[in-house]
From Swiss-Prot:
EC numbers, comma separated: 3.4.21.22
TM region(s), chain numbering: none
Protein known as: Coagulation factor IX
Pathological association: Defects in F9 are the cause of hemophilia B (HEMB).
MF-aspect GO terms: calcium ion binding; endopeptidase activity; serine-type endopeptidase activity
């Protein structure tokens, strides 16, 4: 029995020794067996996981200093900390128009691409949208940011968007105190800008039948107040008040070419209001030179390129009753015209074949779309002309108003957009007034008159 018991003891000891040899492995094999598999960590924090970050800040709450020990870099720690404290504020993609979102603690910042501003890059500040919020002219600078500018005689205000007078009597501005301006403001109209193809080839015909009447009138208009249209001038020649015109600067007036007759002496009267009495605001000047547009040819068509310049013998004295009209560049002259309505003025006939007005008349006329304009007449409407007026008739420019202004007001400043040219009768139903489109001649005007 004792022998059997000893044999069992020896066997157990041998088994334990063999088992011990199987349990204790070398270091390399033991590391393979005992290494903990990496736990999956989803989301933006994965890129920050280094060293003990997961143990320090994900499995447990950590402080900024503890996270700093892991990153060993303040900038990277700060980026991690912004998301760690309150989550990713950029997760909802709040930045519009391809803006880049940068997360922050309890907030975010949008880095906007050129042409956009605002908390979420929601404001389009390119010139194509509401004129870049500029009150007159807009262009993009070298960095693609909006740069506002003003016409001659004005300067940018502190907001760098509005324009304020830089001279005592700047163009297009009514300065007579008692006149209350009720014209349409342009700030809500810039969003409707419609750019016309300025390279469109003009239609030229060799023989065109002439319409019955020059436009020398404002039919259905209202009496203007003294100084309400201080750029308006009266032309006297063989007869008085045969045409109108507009002051460009102290030495030059623009009118219609068909108003000019060879060898006929012309005088202009600026500051005129009531032709039947002297009001001590009038200034008379002699015309010493006339310049017809180089494309004007009355033998082919009396009203095509119907524009002329008159040089005065002495400069006009600018004041509240004698003020030049503003002339924009070609692009903006066309844009302003497309605002949809303008003002015409003159001393022409107050009804068809009737008497001429003694007091300056004015009328607000809507722009007529080109298709309607073409359908309204058998005569040729060239691309350098436009139609304005009322389909129902009763209101129009008329005989005696030719050469006078069609102006568009922009933020209280009036710009020349047309010249009264011709029409079929006056104020007839279904007929419109035809005007010379000033945008086509801006460069020529500025070149000849040295207008800046």
């Amino acid at each position: 029995m004792a022998e059997a018991s000893g044999l069992v003891t020896v066997c157990l000891l041998g088994y334990l020794l063999s088992a011990e040899c199987a349990v204790f492995l070398d270091r390399e094999n033991a590391t393979k067996i005992l290494s903990r598999p990496k736990r999956y960590n989803s989301g933006k924090l994965e890129e920050f996981v280094r060293g003990n970050l997961e143990r320090e800040c994900i499995e447990e709450k950590c402080s900024f200093e503890e996270a700093r020990e892991v990153f060993e870099n303040t900038e990277k720690t700060t980026e991690f900390w912004k998301q760690y404290v309150d989550g990713d504020q950029c997760e909802s993609n709040p930045c519009l128009n391809d803006g880049v979102c940068k997360d922050d603690i309890n907030s975010y910042e949008c880095w906007c691409r050129a042409g956009f501003e605002g908390k979420n890059c929601e404001l389009d500040v390119t010139c194509n949208i509401k004129n870049g919020r500029c009150k007159q002219f807009c262009k993009l600078g070298p960095d693609n940011k909006v740069v506002c500018s003003c016409t001659t005689g004005y300067q940018l205000a502190e907001d760098q968007r509005s324009c304020e007078p830089a001279v005592p009597f700047p163009c297009g501005r009514v300065s007579v105190p008692h006149i209350s301006m009720t014209r349409t403001r342009a700030e809500t109209l810039f969003s409707n800008m419609d750019y016309e193809n300025s390279t469109e080839v003009e239609k030229i015909l060799d023989n065109v039948t002439q319409p019955l009447n020059d436009f020398t009138r404002v039919v259905g208009g209202k009496d203007a107040k003294p100084g309400q249209f201080p750029w308006q001038v009266l032309l006297n020649g063989k007869v008085d008040a045969f045409c109108g015109g507009s002051i460009i600067n102290e030495k030059w007036v623009v009118t219609a070419a068909h108003c000019i007759e060879p060898d006929v002496k012309i005088t202009i009267v600026a500051g005129e209001h009531n032709t039947e009495k002297r009001e001590h605001t009038e200034q008379k000047r002699n015309v010493i030179r006339t310049i017809l547009h180089h494309s004007y040819n009355a033998t082919i068509n009396k009203y095509n390129h119907d524009i002329a310049l008159l040089e005065l013998d002495e400069p006009l004295t600018l004041n509240s009753y004698v003020t030049p009209i503003c002339i924009a560049d070609r692009e903006y002259s066309n844009i302003f015209l497309k605002f949809g309505s303008g003002y015409v003025s003159g001393w022409g006939r107050v009804f068809n074949k009737g008497r001429s007005a003694s007091i300056l008349q004015y009328l607000k006329v809507p722009l007529v779309d080109r298709a309607t304009c073409l359908r309204s007449t058998k005569f040729t409407i060239y691309n350098n002309m436009f139609c304005a007026g009322f389909h129902e008739g009763g209101k129009d420019s008329c005989q005696g108003d030719s050469g006078g202004p069609h102006v568009t007001e922009v933020e209280g400043i009036s710009f020349l957009t047309g010249i009264i040219s011709w029409g079929e009768e006056c104020a007839m139903k279904g007929k419109y007034g035809i005007y010379t489109k000033v945008s086509r001649y801006v460069n020529w005007i500025k070149e000849k008159t040295k207008l800046t």
